[in-house]
Amino acid sequence: MPKMKTLKSASRRIKITGTGKVMAFKSGKRHQNTGKSGDEIRGKGKGFVLAKSEWARMKLMLPKGK
């Protein structure tokens, strides 16, 4: 059986915490921020925990857990 490979697009968008939770990051922070408030831009920098129903699927995309 061949090695499991990491889905690179997923590795850039999500991460698995030390306790096994799956975190993602909010979109809309990279460019075109002139009309947004500072609170909005800072709020988009924080990650959030995905729903438990999605954890198993995301962990298949990241077999090494990174």
From Swiss-Prot:
Gene3D superfamilies: 4.10.410.60
Assigned keywords, A-Z: Ribonucleoprotein, Ribosomal protein
GO molecular function: structural constituent of ribosome
Pfam assignment, any one: Ribosomal_L35p
PROSITE patterns: RIBOSOMAL_L35 (PS00936)
UniProt-listed GO biological process terms: translation
SUPFAM superfamilies xref list: L35p-like
GO CC annotations, alphabetized: cytosolic large ribosomal subunit
Database matches in PANTHER family: 54S RIBOSOMAL PROTEIN BL35M, LARGE RIBOSOMAL SUBUNIT PROTEIN BL35M
Entry-linked HAMAP family: Ribosomal_bL35 (MF_00514)
Family to which the UniProt record says this protein belongs: Belongs to the bacterial ribosomal protein bL35 family.
Protein name: Large ribosomal subunit protein bL35
Organism of this sequence: Deinococcus deserti (strain DSM 17065 / CIP 109153 / LMG 22923 / VCD115)
Gene (name only): rpmI
